[in-house]
Amino acid sequence: MRRIDTEILVIGGGGTGVGIAWDAALRGFGVVLVEKRDLTHGTTGRFHGLLHSGGRYVVKDPQSAAECIAENRILRRTHTHCIEDTGGFFVVTPEDEGDYPDRFLAACRQIGVPCQEVPVAEALRREPLLNPRVSRVFEVPDGSVDGFLATHATAQAAVRAGAQVLTYHEVVGLLVEGSEGDRRVVGARVRDLACGEEVEVHAALTINAAGAWAGQIARLAGLTVQVIPGKGALLAMNHRIVNTVINRCRMPSDGDIIVPAHTVAVVGTTDRRVNDPEVFSVEPWEVRLLLEEADKLVPGITGARVVRAWAGVRPLYEEHQTGATRDTTRAFTLLDHRARDGVAGLLTIIGGKWTTFRLMAEKAVDKACEQLGARKPCTTATTPVPGAERGYYWLGHRLHEVEEHHLQGELVCECELVTRAMVENAVRANPALTLDDLRRDLRLGKGPCQGGFCTYRAAGIMHELACHATPSQAGQEGRRWEVERLECPADQAAGAGSAAPVCPPPSDLWNPNLLLRDFLQERWKGAMPVLWGDQMRQERFDELIYLSLMNADHLPDEGLCSPMTGFYGA
């Protein structure tokens, strides 16, 4: 069995895990991160994309609010290009009257969240679709963040600092030495899902940052970490109905936020306790509830087109919590299992929000320094990730580049303005096993057609690249995790001639029929809960192309399965 030796092993490829790898690598530690699927597959890739100002929690959870506003300011410097500076409104609807707005304003001032009351007329001028019956509006520095890009950019920064990032490597066991009362975790046994090979990763310290799966990882060492999985459903509208984050000015509840995100608006969210963190299905009642509540913020939204529904599972934690997940703190917890359970060599970090991932990573690596006997200061608060120099994201950047450089003929995905060069360079730069990986890299298939057209083109491009790859180009050695300008059509077109070699996976996972089947099945899961009106007609059209025109469900795939086939089909 192959063996890898390192100082710190990080389990989990979400925002927190990647942040830990970045922080630890910058402090000079040897770091290996393992993630059982692609980066951001879990909670980080399934939230509403809100960069919290802290306003949502100033009354109910002031500790979390204080952490959010402090990290908000830092991330605007370190991950600038991943953030759209939308600002945020907290609005008082006719159903929200009472003393909460005054308590909200006072709490913002006490905690240090910048907040000012703006005239309703001014708010309606900036957001014409906002409910005209709102009585008060407060402005806070919320923002919209691309969690996929931010996490991949952080991974790139970690790799440049010396870390090793292994996606599609699932932990199948923890390596534990010693007897009862004197046990130590010395690493993990992981399985490469692309080829089936098992690898032992030996480390002086293992950090469990698996989010909603952290309890499952802890059980591999015979430990109990009571994770409270709180499922939140979300909806993507087919266009940006608002350009400012809109919150209900009330205690956090279901369906009380709308976030502009790239070309769409995200309506969220619900909060229901589930037993299994893999439960991502969205129920019809959740869709109805979200639309009905959002209609109180933007009247008429119930008649707008919804292109997709999805859910994420929050990794909430309280040692003795038994009530509703809405009542669980959004602050994070760092567990030292040596002090807590008598098992050395293992830390678990859980809870928190995406906005606080950098702070969570800092505290985890501080504890790692303490246990490994090294005093190395954290520098992530002042170290921008690659791409931050471009400044804030703005919605029209892709259209501007496509038009300025006459790239219309190169478009693979018209909805999200993804060009052929972008697809080719994404495949070369990152360890993509599926088209779903390209969705996270490029927003491929995220528009109203949900991959109805671009899927075939992208699958063909990947197949073509694989056919022209030489044996010496295969493997993971060529993966560079270079993402800082991956979403810029003009840059990718200019760099296409000097692109890196293609590194297909070490098996037939790029079979085009397999790529097609898996990706369209993944898109179908998100479309099923919102099949009515225009989206029903769109999906019927996509189905006719796939089944009737292409006869794609009968194309031979040699019985192949990808690491994601079972998940997509569930």
Question: How should these model regions be labeled?
Answer:
Residues I11, V201-G211:
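Short hydrophobic core segments
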Residues N208-G222:
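Flavin (primarily FAD) binding-site architecture
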Residues G147, Q226-A233, H239-I241, V245, ...:
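C-terminal catalytic lobe of FAD-dependent flavoproteins
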Residues H48-E122, R126:
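Dinucleotide-binding Rossmann-like beta1-alpha1 core, especially the glycine-rich loop
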Residues R2-T16:
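Beta1/beta-strand and adjacent pyrophosphate-binding region of the FAD-binding site
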Residues A25-G45:
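Glycine-rich FAD pyrophosphate-binding loop
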Residues V92-G162, L166-T167, G173-R184, H262, ...:
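Flavin (FAD/FMN) cofactor-binding and adjacent substrate-gating region
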Residues I4-T6, C195-L205:
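Core beta-strand elements of the Rossmann-like FAD/NAD(P) dinucleotide-binding domain
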